[in-house]
Amino acid sequence: MAGNRNEEMVYCSFCGKNQEEVKKIIAGNGVFICNECVALSQEIIREETAEEVLADLAETPKPKELLDILNNYVVGQDRVKRALAVAVYNHYKRINFTESREDNDVDLQKSNILMIGPTGSGKTYLAQTLARSLNVPFAIADATSLTEAGYVGEDVENILLKLIQAADFNIERAERGIIYVDEIDKIAKKGENVSITRDVSGEGVQQALLKIIEGTVASVPPQGGRKHPNQEMIQIDTKNILFIVGGAFDGIEDIVKQRLGEKIIGFGQNNKAIDDESSYMKEIVAEDIQKFGLIPEFIGRLPVLATLEQLTVDDLVRILTEPRNALVKQYQTLLSYDGVELEFDQDALEAIASKAIERKTGARGLRSIIEEVMMDVMFEIPSLEDVTKVRITKEAVDGKAAPVLETA
């Protein structure tokens, strides 16, 4: 009987242990592997992946190189681009420094970033461009959709799920990614005094975000949504994730004026020019942000403050034409596939920029304006074989005339 038992015993093809010495043995095509060897294999793969990620980060571009990359895609905002280049370089240098030295008594803090600037000034695009240039996973979240645990809405952990998905569920890569949280000003407390009642979309969300921003091992539901008992969770350490948060902070310039001892512009007085408003934005300090409604602990985890300026007509015209993937170049490429040249008059470009400013959409509104102007042209051109050139005039932008079509 004993001999029969040995003949029926299954052994791991890798470590030689039998089925009684381990918890489980998985059968394959003529081979067997035990749970212990599976766990060891996973650990080896995890370590090798982490080494590959660190090797990639060791080649992080220097601040000047990052600035050159940003300049290829982003027009203006020179102060902000320099600040971001330094902060991002220091962040990944910190990761390399921490990982490469064991008994190190110097604790380098994260360089998380707070960007303040009007709608359409380039906050999201700057963050996207940085992540793309570094080849790291990137996720965007809207703070207004977040609620603290226990309320209807999105848990803050779901932000981390977006990053994990962007990293193709490679946790090591995700743990060194970048998360951009937009509309952060919309979760400001209403006033400086702490509310007695629970603040679902204000301080409570700030407290929840604070934990993952400062660094914690978070449990993330793999399918998103709310956490449920007995649900298997993904564990992710956020200590090396770079958080960039942004918002318009409408009205914060009045708080700055009060602090500086100047009267707030009221009825019967002329509004300040954009240049004056921009100068106030440059004076923003942590005290002003706290008065606006962000809690001190949250502000303290965002040491790098970058304020973006309102884009002018000249800035928007440059955005339309200069960057590597400028909108004008994109539409010229589209029409070139139909064998047609596309040209914008200078005053047409200025009219497009002026419309974006009037609509208070900034750079993000430029594409929709061009679409309005180009819609009929893009509909007709593929069927008009004799057209060789399309010229967009100011009158076409203003809706007073059709674009000029030139034929062979």
Swiss-Prot record:
This is ATP-dependent Clp protease ATP-binding subunit ClpX. ATP-dependent specificity component of the Clp protease. It directs the protease to specific substrates. Can perform chaperone functions in the absence of ClpP. InterPro entries: AAA+_ATPase, ATP-dep_Clp_protease_ClpX, ATPase_AAA_core, Clp_ATPase_C, Clp_protease_ATP-bd_su_ClpX, ClpX_bact, P-loop_NTPase, Znf_CppX_C4. ATP binds at P118, T119, G120, S121, G122, K123, T124, Y125. Pfam families: AAA_2, ClpB_D2-small, zf-C4_ClpX. The keyword Nucleotide-binding applies. Zn(2+) binds at C12, C15, C34, C37. SMART domains: AAA, ClpB_D2-small, zf-C4_ClpX. GO terms for cellular component: HslUV protease complex. The gene is clpX. The keyword Nucleotide-binding applies. Component of the ClpX-ClpP complex. Forms a hexameric ring that, in the presence of ATP, binds to fourteen ClpP subunits assembled into a disk-like structure with a central cavity, resembling the structure of eukaryotic proteasomes. Keywords: ATP-binding, Chaperone, Metal-binding, Nucleotide-binding, Zinc. GO terms for biological process: cell division; proteolysis involved in protein catabolic process. Belongs to the ClpX chaperone family. Residues 1-53 form the ClpX-type ZB domain. GO terms for molecular function: ATP binding; ATP hydrolysis activity; ATP-dependent protein folding chaperone; protein dimerization activity; unfolded protein binding; zinc ion binding. It comes from the Bacteria.
